[in-house]
Amino acid sequence: MKKMKSIIAVVLALVLAFGTVTCAFAAPQSGETEQTMSVAQAVDTLTQSAKEKGDCSDGDCDYSPVIAVPGINHSPTYLYDENDNPVLNKDGKQIGGSLLIIDTDPLVEIILKKLALPLIKMLVTQTDSGFPDAVYDVVSELFSIQSCDKQGNMINNLKTEEYGSLASMDEDTRAWAYRMIPMQKLTNVIGEDHTYFFTFNLVGNPIDSATALHEYIQQVKKETGHDKVSLLNVSLGGTIFTAYIDMYGWDDIDEVVNAVAATDGSDIIADFFTRGAEGFRIEDEFLYHEYIPKIIEESMDSPALGYLINILIRIIPHQVLCDTLTRAMDGIMDTLLVNCPQFWALVPSDKYDELSKKYLSSPEYAELKAKTDRYHEAQLNLRENILEGHAKGVEINSIAGAGLAFGDVEYSYFSIIRSAETVNSDGIIQLSSTTMGATAAAPGEKLPEDYEPVKRGYMSVDGSIDASTAVLPDNTWIFVGQHHEAGNNDVVLTLACAFITDPELKDVHSKPDVWPQYNGTCRTKELRRWLLPDAYAVKEEWAQLSPEDEQPDPADVAELDAAIAQGEEALNMTIADAEKADAATERLTNILVKLGKRSPKEEQSQIITVLEPVLCALSLVALRTIGGNGYSDVVRAVIKGVISHI
């Protein structure tokens, strides 16, 4: 699946607008014993809460129900015909998806029918030959299922799956929900019957989605007997939260946890709407040498193929390539982005006026602009609305990743965005959006020496971030080096759970040794999702052995037990330590490989190892000698020069 993403990213280079740092803060050396005790106490608090949790009905428990308002890839949506009958593909499966809904059955036929002949003509004649327009037609058809009209309404009959509590889900759906948002630490305490999963349409209207959330909240209150709910807003869910509180206020809300939430959009979408050299990094060196290898390396662990593509892509004349990418982008803009209110909700508030004037000034867009204007109003009211909720006693905490450029770590195709050069982000959403106002220098840089924070005591140690400008600086928690895919870091998951379940954790001053305002990054997903479950399964297998069966080597038993303990310790960290997480991952992997439960990691092919620097050098030579020109451009220039001297 990841390789397919890379292929699509290469083919559509500038088109894809969708998804999801090498140093991390280590645990402080001083006060290590006291900190270890504090961490243990924090974990014990969560464990004790889980033990004390019993059946809850009629609102007679300590925890209000939590509603997850999820991200961009978390709301399965399906295509229906005009009679509300499911539309099936040739295999009898309903057409749908949680991100892009594409009917792949006719894809090859469409490409062959519309692209093959123009492509051949273009390559043979080294001229346009209608190829860019053919690409526009294919892209438009590719994304047509989720297209909206100029009023901002979905053209097709799309219905989004709706869910209740995790307890009400079937086993497969519940497992899927946990994969989308790893909430096990939360449900272990408050129960699956008190954890709900709201969904909304990716190409809908955020104002309508906020209304649906309000109705959903009333139903949850009725089911659980509570008079308030808590909201866990994840990524794109932040746009629905922004609209909701502007429309309905705080009467139904107990607590709010914003987890990498897009409360003020993403510069990625703003740059896609901006387009051209102001929106994209289309300089020759980046486009013809750096970009494609970066995408390829993410999924193939080597950029070699990317450098080869750099060399081959010059078969296409420079202007034809530019025109092709432009028309591909036109296809996305015309069928999906411009007409979709939800994507306009991802335009940061300070860029909305300029971009809406650019695209929505025509009278035919009046209805759509009324919808986008209403959401923009909610964006502008966000600070005031948050302060109002805080004054009413609603606990509102924000978790954010920082220190990365767009396209860092994962989803490297976003590195094409111009803002990648200047904006501090989690790789997907800028820090100012996920923190509701924190100030930050560009990735890898520091704030100016003469910078004056609004309030002392909220700067990062390296001087790159100031949380004092956030709406609620005391409730803003920043993980430096953390990518937007925060589910990879169990420290983030534990903190999100603690906000709701630990009554002593009120703000960044409550337990600074356990939960510092500035944390780090680590990758524990493999431990949680695969390695530890596999290790537990081995232990269970051994427990089922009879005395007559061959017994495991005592040394292996001891090593597996030690590796499990080390892995569990890594999952319970409250201060992210990448070295500890990696060491635990490596140790569990090694013993499972030894026991035959996992395959050893494949080493990179010697051919690739040899070819990579060679292809990189050839790509660089081409860049230095002919710049952004195609091969035929150079030939034409040479011929023209020769003729001029005859």
Language model region names:
Residues 4-25:
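Sec-dependent N-terminal signal peptides of Gram-positive bacterial secreted proteins and lipoproteins
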Residues 12, 42-55, 377-386:
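Short alpha-helical segments and helix-capping/turn motifs at coil-helix boundaries
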Residues 18-36, 628-629:
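Sec-dependent signal peptide cleavage junction
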Residues 31-232, 238-291, 405, 412-530:
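N-terminal non-catalytic accessory region
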Residues 193-207, 326-417, 442-444:
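Alpha/beta-hydrolase fold catalytic core
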Residues 247, 258-261, 266-371, 398, ...:
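Alpha/beta-hydrolase
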Residues 526, 530, 599-646:
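C-terminal cell-surface addressing/anchoring modules of secreted/extracellular proteins
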Residues 527-604:
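Beta-rich interaction/scaffold domains
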